[in-house]
Amino acid sequence: IEGLSEIVAQPSVSSTGEGVSKCCELIVKKMKAIGMDVQTYPIEPHSVIIGKIGADPSKKTVLIYAHYDVQPQGDLTQWRTPPFEPTIIEGVMYGRGTADNKGPLMAHLNAIEFWLKEYGELPVNIKTIFEGSEESNSEGLPEFLCSHKELLKADMVYFSDGSKNHNDQPIIALGVKGMLYVELVLTTMTRNVHSQYAPVLPSAAWQMVQLLNKLKTEDGTVHIPGFYDDVVQPTEIEKAIYDKLPDVRENLFRSYGAYPIYPADKGYYIQLNGTPSFNISGISSGYTGNGTATVLTSKAIAKIDMRLVAAQDGNKILDNLKQYIKKLGYDNVEVICHGITEPAKTPVDTPYLLPVEKATRNVFGPYMVYPNRPSTAPDYLWTNILGLPTIQVRWCDATSDNHAPNEHLTLSNYIKGTELTATVLKEISEM
């Protein structure tokens, strides 16, 4: 707990660079202290830390991934405690990065240290890769992996990044959605003017609203040409797994004060995990301050994230989006791509699923298996570039508030997360 508190207290905001190098140094120091061979690779924008321990050819080799960078702190007035002053309240540690992803990172190191202290050796060979740019689309990491495949040679990849479901059960995930993130900048005039001219001059705000309604209609259909062409539907085995999952909808809706929007003809989990999405992450135009101002807006900005499922090609969709906007007559729109992450998937019949399931059951009890999960992580780096089966176990709090004010991690989950990694290593060694 003290070690986690120490690295949470060290800012490591990848988007601004704040404290990232110092956090890297702190983690390297901790890794060396438990006996790992450690090498730092100064790739742009932030360093990758590679750790190794064990080289027994008769043992399996597990590559453990985590990231040490965090999201910006956001609105400080919304935090109950300072984000980089980790505070424990009633068994819960509050602070930026507690759950995403410094808690799991430290749990992995704790598990390695446990095996070495208790038994003098690990049941498997371990390689670790900790990056400092996950929250910035893992920039620079694909190129690093392509040129260091031998260094990272392993049998499988294991990591923990994410939360339990809303029934407080850990989630074992074998795949993730990809993401295409774009910014649409629509300009109608050189500057804002008095709204008295609304009858005769164009409004950027209204044009943006109209454009967005053409890209995705009220029934949820995305109208970018070819958007759904390459979608791989869930297999019958995957559908059977989804059908067995518990109903978490009531707890989910209650937690967020929301109501369901998914179509009645699709199951909740297939809609959540197996369907691509088109989301407005942010939209801005004109006057949004206190009080009133009568403004005819000259510029409108919308930030869009599209979550992609297996076989969808972000580059292809980006090209189609640009062409479609032009075809609709919006020559005044600039499309800025802020990043593309490929979807990734490990088949549910991988032999590594059973030992991970057994370990999770022994440590946490009831759990869920997701053939694919709804969020995005750089799993394609391991499945597509390194060609390795990849399994993730999400065990942080269901309401851990990742990316939001008051991010937190229940210490009992942190302790169990440590125990889980230690047990996963044991179960894999006995395959």
Predicted regions and their residues:
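N-terminal helical capping/dimerization or prosegment-like subdomains
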Residues: 1-76, 299
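Active-site metal-coordination/substrate-binding segment of hydrolases
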Residues: 59-130, 150, 416
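A common structural junction motif
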Residues: 69, 215-219, 322-331
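Acidic/histidine-rich catalytic neighborhood of metal-dependent amide-processing enzymes
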Residues: 101-175
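A short core secondary-structure module
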Residues: 143, 198-220
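An extended, acidic, His-containing surface patch that forms the Zn2+-binding/catalytic region
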Residues: 166-167, 223-299, 307-320, 328, ...
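Flexible glycine/proline-rich, aromatic-decorated loop/lid segments
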Residues: 171-187, 391-395
